[in-house]
Amino acid sequence: MKERTIQPVNNGLNGNITIPGDKSISHRAVMFGAIAEGKTTIKGFLPGADCLSTISCFKEMGVDIVQNGDEVTVVGKGLEGLQEPKAILDVGNSGTTIRLMSGILANTPFFSCVQGDASIAKRPMKRVTNPLKQMGANIDGREEGTFTPLTIRGGDLKAIEYTSPVASAQVKSAILLAGLRAEGVTAVTEPHISRDHTERMLEAFGVKVTREGKTVKLAGGQKLTATDVQVPGDVSSAAFFLVAGAIIPNSKLVLQNVGMNPTRTGIIDVLEKMGATFTVEPINEGASEPAANITIETTSLKGIEIGGDIIPRLIDEIPVIALAATQAEGITVIKDAHELKVKETNRIDTVVAELTKLGARIEATDDGMIIYGKSALKGNTVNSYGDHRIGMMLAIAGCLAEGKTTIEDAEAVGVSYPTFFEELQRLTK
């Protein structure tokens, strides 16, 4: 268990950063390339642990994949060309891999067993296995399909019209991917619109997808045709430096090639509402996944209330938003964020516990947290508990704190941002 010591930053963070590739888009590009016909080239791929797990799983199913840094080529097998894996498919720490891949495996006529690490073993799978069972898939797991390992024997599926109790892109994507080989039209309706990378990328691979409000539909029997994918920078990774630029005194940062998919930019809306000073310069208008360069500098923030439809658009950014709120004048309330409880850690409890160790005034609620600003943070020993987003949030907090901050289990950041600590060090010089 590696630890990392963060020293206070006295002269701000300054410089340009090229944000690493979007994790959600990188996963999907590999998966869709694997079930497409032809060769897909992916540029800007995120070579983090989670996305490498996706590559490993599809290689195990006979797909020819070559990865060289942030460039990947995938020679697709088509929807019917995957081979039965000889070994257990290990997703590591990746919830995206196991949930989306389950949708693909559900319609593939062979047996597979899927598992991950200790964190994955605690994460709820029934939200995916239940609708897939309704479509006719033969899926089982611990506690009646609630937890991994999952066993899947795929086969002929029937389309369903599914109303999801949660706004989850992973649930929606698993059902849509299963629907590619189902008989009829598959429809998924959500309580709020979740991130739409799957819909956008399916369209780029030639699949017709219909969107009507909170409902997404596709007809079975459609094939994917290989295409080249340019992955923009991950806005969830950018969020740590956006907040750092806003709250660490004397900072000015230029974040290059940040993905600006409107289902993901809740962090931008929240920082604007809190009073942050930044500019957004679009760089690839018209692309299926928009991107921009963002310049942000230190400013005074004010507390706000965050809840409702915006939550699915910033669910992964809430840990670092909570940190921003500790430096804002007044009270910030985050609500409607129950999903935080079933992430890599229970992020409500983890954020509150670790920021409290640093001197923040913050309390947990059933569906979020209340943060009382403005807090002077003091260095301490804290822990990521194996959660990459907690680790990066604590590193930014350490830059602000008086005295050194030691982060235990710091290597977790490699899941989504392998070069995070090197970038942070470079920007402090």
UniProtKB/Swiss-Prot annotation:
GO terms for molecular function: 3-phosphoshikimate 1-carboxyvinyltransferase activity. Its EC number is 2.5.1.19. The keyword DNA-binding does not apply. Keywords: Amino-acid biosynthesis, Aromatic amino acid biosynthesis, Cytoplasm, Transferase. Pathway: Metabolic intermediate biosynthesis; chorismate biosynthesis; chorismate from D-erythrose 4-phosphate and phosphoenolpyruvate: step 6/7. InterPro entries: Enolpyruvate_Tfrase_dom (IPR001986), Enolpyruvate_Tfrase_sf (IPR036968), EPSP_synthase (IPR006264), EPSP_synthase_CS (IPR023193), RNA3'P_cycl/enolpyr_Trfase_a/b (IPR013792). It is found in: Cytoplasm. One of its GO terms (cellular component) is cytoplasm. It catalyses: 3-phosphoshikimate + phosphoenolpyruvate = 5-O-(1-carboxyvinyl)-3-phosphoshikimate + phosphate. It is an enzyme of class 2 (transferase). It comes from the Bacteria. GO terms for biological process: amino acid biosynthetic process; aromatic amino acid family biosynthetic process; chorismate biosynthetic process. Pfam families: EPSP_synthase (PF00275). The active site is at D316 (proton acceptor). Phosphoenolpyruvate binds at K23, G95, R123, Q170, R347, R389. 3-phosphoshikimate binds at K23, S24, R28, S168, Q170, D316, K343. NCBIfam families: aroA. Catalyzes the transfer of the enolpyruvyl moiety of phosphoenolpyruvate (PEP) to the 5-hydroxyl of shikimate-3-phosphate (S3P) to produce enolpyruvyl shikimate-3-phosphate and inorganic phosphate. Belongs to the EPSP synthase family. Monomer. This is 3-phosphoshikimate 1-carboxyvinyltransferase.
